Regions:
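Alpha-helical bundle regulatory/interaction domains
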Residues: 1-45, 52-53, 57, 69-133
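Short, basic-rich loop-to-helix N-cap that marks the start of a DNA-contacting helix
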Residues: 60-64
Length: 133
């Protein structure tokens, strides 16, 4: 294997390690310094490489991950929007609603109303039923 290929492979492995940590601990406070430590790279290198690897910033990935989980909870539970907001890791209902609307295109409450009449694709449901291990 060429040295360049090994370097790229190692970089990908480090970025996947950080993304996996984000997937497991999405509801916890995560920041770039902590994620860079997980990937064993500098903060600037982490942000640049994560974006190049996954097509979005670490912050945006984490927001999207949290919103995806919130979508599931809004569809499948009757818990309040505020409870869901805090469970998925947002610090305030206002930030949650703005981010949700930005990503989904409607408010959490509107999504819940509409989601009760829409079928859920099996592949999406199965992704949320897998264990967190």
């Amino acid at each position: 294997m060429e040295p360049v290929s090994r370097a790229v492979e190692e970089t990908n492995r480090r970025m996947l390690r950080a993304r996996d940590a984000m997937d497991r601990a999405y509801a916890q406070p995560l920041d770039v310094p902590a994620l860079a430590r997980i990937a064993h790279v500098s903060e600037a290198h982490f942000t640049r490489t994560f974006r190049a690897t996954f097509g979005e910033t670490p912050h945006r990935y984490l927001q999207r991950r949290r919103v995806e989980r919130a979508m599931f909870l809004l569809r499948e539970t009757d818990r309040s929007v505020t409870d869901i907001c805090f469970e998925v890791g947002f610090g305030s209902p206002g930030t949650f609603s703005r981010t949700f609307r930005d990503i989904v295109g409607r408010s959490p409450r509107a999504y819940r109303r509409e989601a009760t009449t829409m079928p859920v694709p099996t592949c999406f449901t199965m992704a949320w039923l897998r264990p967190n291990a």
